[in-house]
């Protein structure tokens, strides 16, 4: 389709929001296919019995504490998976034996309709969604009661014990909350063609936003302008927004993995790490690009320093080689290890790492010294959540369980595919491949302080050399990759490498 260009003037600065080469697709295009019932059938096939009732609540409207304003709405992903419904205050049941999907929409509220417009009604829901029956919410309790009376020995499958559709009174309901999540996760981790198209659409919006930022980077003075333009382009292209909080970290902020303040000036800094992805129809993209700040570059060069260019080249090599290894049957943990092997080789070449007298390269590997500069996993599953479900998400490592108990981790955290116990990659999985190298002052100073301790990482670090790289901050490059039977398909089209530099410098 033909690309288009929209020029916006802000405070005397001309910004071309959609530069040539950005994703110029039909904004009026609608997502006409709803695979909700197909997904419900897939889930049912994974349950222990091919009889029973599945119940899932959608996200309800919730007010912020001590406020009359609604919290930002985000549809519950498990509910969306079997309905495709994006509106709030809905519920769904699926009678497995009868193959009947019933959607419950909010009861009509005259006052609410006057103030905020009509909620999803029965006729509209019947036209828009692939369901067998639509009822108002007030019918839910009676329907479940009658189903239970007719099927007294069958289970009602729910995700969590606190998500019961009816409080047991006169009927002995058999609620089963152990099987449904495992079944849904097993289905969600393998994307069908419709889901892949939605993830690719999200990536196209992300690509357009990243292009716009690169083309207009020379106008910007603050991280906030980068983050703001990304959201602007996403909304303009009919995305509901971003799939997660945008990370626009300049200078040392780029060494903080999930930096989201996005409010500091760009002046005097070399690089920006921009981790920002659009959402499309509840499906996420997750894209990271690292690029030089034009005001820090002089003399016709592309990079603000030799150190920045070197680190970018290493991360680029890490990503390219790792993506080439993604295929059905591969162990992502092994690909993750390959990324660390490249980091070790290259950091030794730069003199950032060293092999002390009496030590060997194997000692550096055993000490996991590269984790000082590459402290996160190579990637994660992607889908309805940016950190999407895994096939074995019901169990998590002990150390993660401890973090969850401390309140440091959501209870919905899923096992990443780069753990040793994760199953091999399978066709239909979508994963991120996001190697990075970071020069985090806190981590470096701690390693320096502990360098004389046995088994410390600092023993293998040349801290004088490291200081030359601290101003780089960090570099991360991230793409969303579909695993296929023949290898993989990269779903991300945001510029990187030479194409990225050409956009920044208008070449």
Curated annotation (Swiss-Prot):
Binding site for Mn(2+) 1: 286, 434, 478
Example GO biological process: proteolysis
Pfam families found in the cross-reference section: AMP_N, Peptidase_M24
UniProt cross-references to SMART domains, sorted A to Z: AMP_N (SM01011)
Annotated EC: 3.4.11.9
Cofactor binding, note field: Binds 2 manganese ions per subunit.
GO molecular function terms attached to this record: manganese ion binding; metalloaminopeptidase activity
UniProt key word rRNA-binding: no
Reactions the enzyme catalyzes: Release of any N-terminal amino acid, including proline, that is linked to proline, even from a dipeptide or tripeptide
Enzyme class: hydrolase
Keywords for the protein's UniProt record, in alphabetical order: Aminopeptidase, Hydrolase, Manganese, Metal-binding, Metalloprotease, Protease
Alphabetized SUPFAM superfamilies for the sequence: Creatinase/aminopeptidase, Creatinase/prolidase N-terminal domain
Keyword Hydrolase annotated: yes
Family, similarity comment: Belongs to the peptidase M24B family.
The protein's role, per its UniProt record: Catalyzes the removal of a penultimate prolyl residue from the N-termini of peptides.
Entry protein name: Probable Xaa-Pro aminopeptidase TRV_02643
The organism of origin for this protein: Trichophyton verrucosum (strain HKI 0517)
């Amino acid at each position: 389709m033909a690309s288009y260009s929209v020029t916006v003037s802000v405070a005397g600065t001309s910004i071309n929001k959609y530069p040539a080469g950005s994703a110029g697709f039909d904004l009026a295009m609608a997502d006409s296919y709803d695979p909700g019932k197909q997904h419900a059938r897939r889930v049912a096939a994974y349950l222990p019995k091919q009889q029973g009732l599945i119940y899932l609540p959608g996200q309800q409207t919730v007010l912020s504490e001590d406020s009359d304003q609604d919290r930002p709405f985000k549809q519950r992903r498990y509910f969306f998976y079997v309905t495709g419904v994006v509106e709030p205050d809905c519920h769904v049941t699926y009678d497995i034996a009868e193959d009947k999907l019933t959607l419950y929409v909010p009861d009509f509220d005259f006052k609410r309709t006057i103030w905020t417009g009509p909620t999803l009604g029965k006729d509209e829901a019947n036209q828009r969604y692939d369901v067998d029956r639509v009822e108002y919410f007030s019918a839910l309790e009676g329907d479940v009661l009658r189903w239970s009376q007719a099927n007294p020995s069958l289970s009602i499958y729910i995700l969590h014990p606190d998500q019961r559709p009816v409080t047991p009174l006169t009927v002995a309901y058999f609620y089963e909350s152990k099987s449904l999540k495992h079944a849904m996760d097993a289905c969600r981790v393998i994307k069908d063609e419709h889901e892949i198209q939605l993830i690719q659409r999200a990536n196209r919006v992300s690509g357009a936003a990243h292009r716009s930022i690169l083309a207009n980077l020379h106008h910007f003075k603050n991280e906030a302008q980068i983050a703001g333009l990304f959201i602007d382009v996403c909304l303009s292209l009919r995305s509901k927004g971003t799939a997660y909080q945008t990370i626009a970290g300049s200078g040392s902020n780029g060494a903080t993995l999930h930096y989201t303040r996005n409010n500091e000036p760009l002046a005097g800094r070399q690089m920006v790490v921009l981790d920002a992805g659009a959402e499309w129809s509840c499906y996420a993209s997750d894209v990271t690009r690292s690029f030089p700040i034009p005001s820090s570059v002089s003399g016709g060069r592309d990079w603000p320093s030799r150190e920045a260019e070197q680190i970018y080249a290493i991360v680029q090599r890490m990503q390219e080689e790792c993506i080439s290894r993604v295929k059905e049957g591969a162990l992502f943990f092994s690909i993750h290890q390959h990324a660390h092997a490249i980091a070790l080789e290259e950091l030794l070449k730069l003199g950032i790492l060293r092999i002390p007298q009496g030590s060997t390269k194997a000692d550096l590997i055993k000490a996991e010294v590269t984790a000082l500069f590459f402290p996160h996993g190579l990637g994660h599953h992607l889908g309805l959540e940016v950190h999407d479900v895994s096939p074995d998400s019901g169990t998590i490592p002990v150390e993660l369980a401890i973090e969850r108990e401390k309140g440091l981790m959501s209870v919905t955290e899923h096992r990443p595919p780069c753990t040793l116990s994760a199953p091999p990659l399978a066709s239909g999985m979508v994963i991120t491949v996001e190697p990075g190298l970071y020069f985090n002052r806190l981590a470096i100073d701690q390693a320096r302080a502990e360098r004389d301790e046995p088994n410390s990482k600092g023993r293998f670090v040349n801290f004088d050399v490291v200081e030359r790289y601290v101003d780089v901050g960090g570099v991360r490059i991230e793409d969303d990759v579909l695993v296929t039977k023949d290898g993989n398909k990269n779903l991300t089209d945001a510029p990187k490498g030479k194409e990225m530099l050409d956009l920044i410098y208008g070449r």
